Each structure stands twice: as C-alpha cells, then as structure tokens.
Amino acid sequence: IFVSDGAKCDLGRLQAMFGADVNVAVQDPSYPVYVDGTVMAGAGGKEPVTENGFKDITYMPCLPENGFFPDLSVVKKDSLIYICSPNNPTGAVATKENLTELVKFAKANGCVVLFDAAYSAFIRDKNLPKSIYEIEGAKDCAIEMQSFSKPAGFTGVRLGWCVVPENLKFDDGSKIADAWARITNTAFNGASNIAQAGGFAALDD
C-alpha cells in the first residue's frame, strides 16, 4: 500500500510507469484523466484526435443498454483497463458479477485493471463491492487507487493511496510493486505530515 497525494496523481504516474507501448481501454464516458494520462505518456497514438477519440485507445461504451458496464470483448489483449466504480460521471456501480467477469477477462487476456475506487465511500448497498479485491483473483491482475478527496473533502489537501499487490507481475516476471516503488520514490516526495494527520482523523471518524 503506497500513501500518495491522491488518486489523480497516482493515475498519471501509473501510465508513465507502463509507458507508450501498451494497449489502453477506458470506460466511455469516464474521468478525463484516464485518456489525458494515456496521451501524455504517448500511448494514444500519433494521429490527431477525432470526434471518435484517439486511435490507439479502446473506448468501452457504458450505456443503459449494457447496464453502464462495458462490453469487454472490444478490449485488446495485454491492455490496461481503466474502471471507475462508482463511475465518474454516470454514478453507476459495478456489481460483484460485473467485477468477477472483469477479473476473469483480465487474467485470461494478460490485462491489468486500474481500478479507481475514489467514490466507494458513497456505496451504501452491502451487496455492491467497494473494492475490486473483494473479488477472488483480483490480486493477480488489479491495481486499486483510493482518495480522501471525496469522503473527507481533501481535494486541495491531497491525500490518497494506491494498492499494488506483491504477486502482480510484468511479463518478464518482475514485480510491478517494485517498479511502482521506484517511480514514486523518483517522482514524488511523499504526502505532507499535515495531510496524513488529517487522513488518520478522517479514518477514525
């Protein structure tokens, strides 16, 4: 578990870690940072953006017809799959069945799920998962980001955390957690003591 300056910052650094030569799939609609971070890392393709988006990004429509959960069949093998639940901006929450399907797909196709759980504090139904790690096998294929901005109003204070399981690995067998530690130690000096003290108080609350 890596303490950070918020989920938004983690999302940008994660894309930088995976680099430009990775396939990326995003929910559509979704939080703009997923696409922006992908493009800034060079993974959006070299062609100019069109009304259909960036050529090298797979957009997964989330519509009433599919219960606002994407059709994973459009996702390429070895992709980073951005999933936000509850979703920003639709508010749709992925069910346990949805996330079970996602984990099975990711493991079968060599994908890594980047699960944005920033709005999980607003889930009141005990039957709906707040974390992807409630799903068996998720620790083999998923990274989860969390934020204090939504439940505690820390938008300007900046505090969050990122979970990178020890058994999550690159194709060469090296640990993603080790690469993430190097990225964060290089590009980030740590959340302030004031922010972390506020985080402890918010958790106690």
PLM regions and their residue ranges:
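Short hydrophobic alpha-helical segments of the AMP-binding
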Residues: 34, 38, 106
